[in-house]
């Protein structure tokens, strides 16, 4: 329930608590770790785009949508790169 409240309030630029900041940092570290592990430039590009999206998250009124779209695209790209890399 608290996590849901934190993500609901993500659209408010003045709101950022420690738990939400930790969650965002964890997501960024996981994407960066996947990029280093898979040695794929595409994952590093997604990491940079996710950083930009986090800025949009606190600037635009559609921040909640932007954030989740970018997280889902990042995870999708990581899974595709991982499956291609380990299949070949």
From Swiss-Prot:
Locations listed in the record: Host membrane
Predominant location: host cell
Top-rank lineage group of the source organism: Viruses
Protein's membrane topology: Multi-pass membrane protein
GO cellular component labels: host cell membrane; membrane
TM stretches of this protein: 16-36, 42-62, 64-84
Chain segments annotated as coiled-coil in the UniProt record: none
Residues of the signal peptide: none
Disulfide bridges in this chain: none
Keywords: Host membrane, Membrane, Transmembrane, Transmembrane helix
Protein name from the UniProt record: Putative transmembrane protein ORF24
């Amino acid at each position: 329930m608290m996590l849901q409240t934190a993500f609901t309030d993500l659209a408010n630029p003045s709101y950022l608590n420690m738990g939400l900041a930790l969650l965002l940092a964890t997501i960024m570290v996981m994407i960066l770790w996947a990029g280093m592990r898979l040695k794929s430039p595409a994952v590093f590009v997604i990491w940079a785009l996710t950083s930009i999206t986090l800025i949009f998250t606190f600037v635009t009124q559609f921040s909640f949508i932007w954030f989740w779209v970018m997280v889902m695209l990042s995870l999708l790209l990581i899974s595709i790169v991982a499956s291609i890399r380990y299949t070949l």
